[in-house]
């Protein structure tokens, strides 16, 4: 029969391996989608302007949605919420946003639309939460976010 210390050591080893496996699953590197010098999600900018600001963009209306949803679908599930936060940008740094202040369509209106891009009525894409929703999309929540960053 194994001694108590051997059983404790085995239990500790099992727990460490479980925690390591869980950490590896949730540690997708989202840097490529949040550290780019170019405007993130360029097709989504057109789609947001169409839907939130009623601005006509080049091409048929469905094309902007199709391209935006395609760009979002190409981002790993674990990184979609973080990429949308990066696209929205901080209010204090509008120059680092994919959104522009437009006459009659402030960034806040556009940000409200960005928050729902992954939902069933729009792109219907799962996120880090295994649902088509992003939690903690208000800037004051970003430091306490549920998505990895």
From Swiss-Prot:
Source organism superkingdom: Eukaryota
SMART domains: AAI
Glycosylation sites: 124
Tissue-specificity statement: Endosperm.
Keyword annotations: Allergen, Alpha-amylase inhibitor, Disulfide bond, Glycoprotein, Protease inhibitor, Secreted, Serine protease inhibitor, Signal
Post-translational modifications reported in the UniProt record: Five disulfide bonds, which are essential for the inhibitor activity, are probably present.
Signal peptide: 1-24
CDD domains: AAI_SS
Pfam families noted in UniProt: Tryp_alpha_amyl
Subcellular location as annotated: Secreted
Disulfide bonds: none
Cross-referenced InterPro entries: Allergen/soft/tryp_amyl_inhib, Allergen/tryp_amyl_inhib_CS, Bifun_inhib/LTP/seed_sf, Bifunc_inhib/LTP/seed_store
Cellular component GO terms, alphabetical: extracellular region
Keyword Secreted belongs to the record: yes
Keyword Secreted tagged: yes
GO molecular function per UniProt: alpha-amylase inhibitor activity; serine-type endopeptidase inhibitor activity
Assembly behavior: Heterotetramer of one CMa, one CMb and two CMd chains.
Function noted in UniProt: Part of a complex with inhibitory activity, but CMb is inactive as a separate subunit.
Homology family: Belongs to the protease inhibitor I6 (cereal trypsin/alpha-amylase inhibitor) family.
Family annotation (PANTHER family): ALPHA-AMYLASE_TRYPSIN INHIBITOR CM16 (PTHR34481:SF7), TRYPSIN/FACTOR XIIA INHIBITOR-RELATED (PTHR34481)
The name this protein goes by in its record: Alpha-amylase/trypsin inhibitor CMb
Organism listed in the record: Hordeum vulgare
């Amino acid at each position: 029969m194994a001694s108590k210390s051997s059983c404790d050591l085995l239990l500790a080893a099992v727990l460490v391996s479980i925690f390591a496996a869980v950490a590896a699953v949730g540690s997708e590197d989202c840097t490529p989608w949040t550290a780019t010098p170019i405007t993130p999600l360029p097709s989504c900018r057109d789609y947001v302007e169409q839907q939130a600001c009623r601005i006509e963009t080049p091409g048929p209306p469905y094309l902007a949605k199709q391209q935006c949803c395609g760009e979002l679908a190409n981002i790993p599930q674990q990184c979609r919420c973080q990429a949308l936060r990066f696209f929205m940008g901080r209010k204090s740094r509008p120059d680092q946003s994919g959104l522009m202040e437009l006459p009659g369509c402030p960034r806040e209106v556009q940000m409200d639309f960005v928050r729902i891009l992954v939902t069933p009525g729009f792109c219907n894409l799962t996120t880090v939460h295994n649902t088509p929703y992003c939690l903690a999309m208000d800037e004051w929540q970003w430091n306490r976010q549920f998505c990895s960053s």
